[in-house]
Swiss-Prot record:
Keyword Amino-acid biosynthesis recorded: no
Organism: Staphylococcus haemolyticus (strain JCSC1435)
Top enzyme category: translocase
Job description of the protein: Part of the ABC transporter complex PstSACB involved in phosphate import. Responsible for energy coupling to the transport system.
Family (UniProt): Belongs to the ABC transporter superfamily. Phosphate importer (TC 3.A.1.7) family.
Protein name stated in the entry: Phosphate import ATP-binding protein PstB
Length: 291
């Protein structure tokens, strides 16, 4: 009985500390999130009654979610709740799994991406993706950045040079790498590799950037740099980011969707989610009571 009481006190202490830490982040970001009203922003993605199955496993259930342009939208939730599956559905990469079946609609710029004649190639050009582990190609930094443009038919050396500089500047890493463009990207640190992957994504000028836990494999300094970069990128791109880090979601996002057991349990302004959630399960998750 004594051990049980000790554990309960430890859990309560941990919960209070987690909530206090997140509240501090939310409070410090209050001005940042005081932006134009949602009514002035266009919907870039509208998910309507989406269900998804892996074979007989019902992984996503009745997802309804409108994602606004030039926002950072955080997708949070415990492992196995459908976060990564959802964002991989947004560019149809999930269909690389043979057993996948979907029902419902996802409208990207008012067009249903599941329509028979909708081009997956065009979708993946417009919607870039950055993965959990940095995954540069085993090529030079220059060749990593120019891979996409060359695939799209750009051959002019001067234009490619301009794309490389613009993309690396966009990823806030040009000054670090401008004298190393022809060295292998594998020789970079993890944080540098991830920013090169972001630059590679920017090189094809996407409209939306999907990020699947982009800092989980990085050290704290590299994580901070990527978070600062995300804040800069949202001026020109719409960013949807999966994260397990509650403080990170509170720091960088404008909207937050909490997924639980394949459902969207709650979706609202990030400040609202972390300071005054409407649902008890949301409150329990962000305060560390489960997950």
């Amino acid at each position: 009985m004594a051990n049980t009481n000790v554990k309960e006190k430890e859990l309560a202490k941990h919960t209070d500390q987690s909530q206090e830490s997140i509240s501090t982040v939310v409070s410090s970001n209050e001005v940042k999130h005081n932006k134009e009203s949602d009514s002035n922003k266009k919907v870039v993605y509208s998910t309507q009654n989406l269900d998804l199955w892996y074979g007989d496993t019902h992984a996503l259930q009745n997802i309804n979610l409108d994602i606004l342009e030039n926002n950072v939208t955080a997708i949070i939730g415990p492992s196995g709740c459908g976060k990564s599956t959802y964002i991989k559905t947004l560019n149809r990469m999930v269909e690389l799994v043979p057993s996948v079946k979907t029902a419902g609609k996802i409208l990207y710029r008012d067009q249903n991406i599941f329509d028979e004649n909708y081009s997956k190639e065009k979708l993946r050009t417009n919607v870039g993706m950055v993965f959990q582990q940095p995954n540069p190609f085993p090529k030079s930094i220059y060749d990593n950045i120019t891979y996409g443009p060359k695939t799209h038919g750009i051959k002019d050396k001067k234009l490619l040079d301009e794309i490389v500089e613009k993309s690396l500047r966009g990823a806030a890493i040009w000054d670090e790498l401008k004298d190393r463009l022809h060295t292998n990207a594998y020789g970079l640190s993890g944080g540098q590799q991830q920013r090169v992957c972001i630059a590679r994504c920017l090189a094809i000028e996407p409209d939306v950037i999907l990020m699947d836990e982009p800092t989980s494999a990085l050290d704290p300094i590299s994580t901070l740099r990527v978070e600062e970069l995300v804040q800069e990128l949202k001026e020109n791109y719409s960013i949807i980011m999966v994260t397990h880090n509650m403080q990170q979601a509170a720091r960088v996002s404008d909207k937050t969707a909490f997924f639980l057991n394949g459902y969207v349990n709650e979706y609202d302004d990030t400040d609202k989610i972390f300071s005054n959630p409407s649902d008890k399960q949301t409150e329990d998750y962000i305060s560390g009571r489960f997950g």
